[in-house]
Swiss-Prot record:
This is L-lactate dehydrogenase. The lineage of its organism: Bacteria, Bacillati, Bacillota, Bacilli, Lactobacillales. Pathway: Fermentation; pyruvate fermentation to lactate; (S)-lactate from pyruvate: step 1/1. One of its GO terms (molecular function) is L-lactate dehydrogenase activity. Belongs to the LDH/MDH superfamily. LDH family. It comes from Streptococcus pneumoniae (strain 70585). It is an enzyme of class 1 (oxidoreductase). Allosterically activated by fructose 1,6-bisphosphate (FBP). It catalyses: (S)-lactate + NAD(+) = pyruvate + NADH + H(+). Catalyzes the conversion of lactate to pyruvate. The gene is ldh. One of its GO terms (biological process) is lactate metabolic process. Pfam families: Ldh_1_C, Ldh_1_N.
Amino acid sequence: MTSTKQHKKVILVGDGAVGSSYAFALVNQGIAQELGIIEIPQLHEKAVGDALDLSHALAFTSPKKIYAAQYSDCADADLVVITAGAPQKPGETRLDLVGKNLAINKSIVTQVVESGFKGIFLVAANPVDVLTYSTWKFSGFPKERVIGSGTSLDSARFRQALAEKLDVDARSVHAYIMGEHGDSEFAVWSHANIAGVNLEEFLKDTQNVQEAELIELFEGVRDAAYTIINKKGATYYGIAVALARITKAILDDENAVLPLSVFQEGQYGVENVFIGQPAVVGAHGIIRPVNIPLNDAETQKMQASAKELQAIIDEAWKNPEFQEASKN
């Protein structure tokens, strides 16, 4: 950064359920020293109220400057996190949100870039893989500095579900969901392990779990958002903590391996889409993808998932407005 500031600054765009939960997670975990919250003009006072409310927790956590921000405040930010978008309603898929949220995304990204922002974009609005792609297109930024939350939450759900099934700590379960953050995602069963022990071997030694149970477990993970939306209207706590984890990895230059929306350049036979796979992430964004050697069935699922995303992108980019706004 060219600014003289000596601390880490995050700008959050979108103070809805996900955004405010993310802000709360940052405060609780002591992540970043400055947090600006941007909302549309008619909701600016909500951002003011949330900033004030969050500031009252600082005496219990760690110092942080929190305020309702403007787009001009993005200029010297290290990270801009986009959660703003139309929420997913009962019965809607994430891909149903494309039309509404691409227009919102274009407006946000344009204003952030116009501020002189030179940091990293982190996208969480849905459909996240498509909106990560559009953020890259509309910003003109290098692909390494545009990151989507990808399958980070899905993988956490998968690990927790396996942990409950096996009666172990989820932190000892190493397993990934890859592909679209949505209906075409898939479990990487071939590399799932418990403390380094292949899942299949672990199951042999510990208990009798049938294949049908594992299929049902994955389906529960895949459909978790629908379950939660039908019961309480929206999902926000899990994704908020996932975003906080990604934020910490970036701001602390951890070079952590996390499952994110990553630009594909031929890995798994996929190109020119952002899609969920593990990647090394640090202060400069995506350092490199971690290309897990998938088996043939998993590779086919990755390609099928990417094909679905590509079809959505191709259809959306028939809109001349999006074509004209593209810088990549």
